[in-house]
Amino acid sequence: MALLRDDRLRGGRRSTDGGKSWEKPVPVETPGDVENSYAVLLKAPSGRVFVFYNRNSDNVREILSHDRQEVITRVDSLGHFVFKYSDDNGRSWSRERYDIPFRLFECDRANVYGGKLCFFWNVGRPFIHN
């Protein structure tokens, strides 16, 4: 399985022949919705596949720079850390999206928004948990 990554998390594609051919993408999120980024897959022992990603759930359109001198319109690395799941190996994804609760760290509390807006960076590759 592979994810098509752009700012909308277009979908997952499946291959059953080791990557020689791929099925059509299955959307994880609604096309044209808010930014979703930095997705990573996890296959659990039960067979359930999770996709974890950043989501601009509050539809923030611009942010202040760390020194408050500039307005920045790149908004794909902020918001909420969320997940959806698939019980059919990526043929479909849960309707429900789940926010992952986390505690604020000093870097969150010290950002220009005092932790009311969080910034994320998630880089990874798919993995299987046995």
Regions found by a protein language model. Give the residues of each.
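Asp-box/BNR beta-propeller blade signature and adjacent active/binding-site loops
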Residues: 1-130
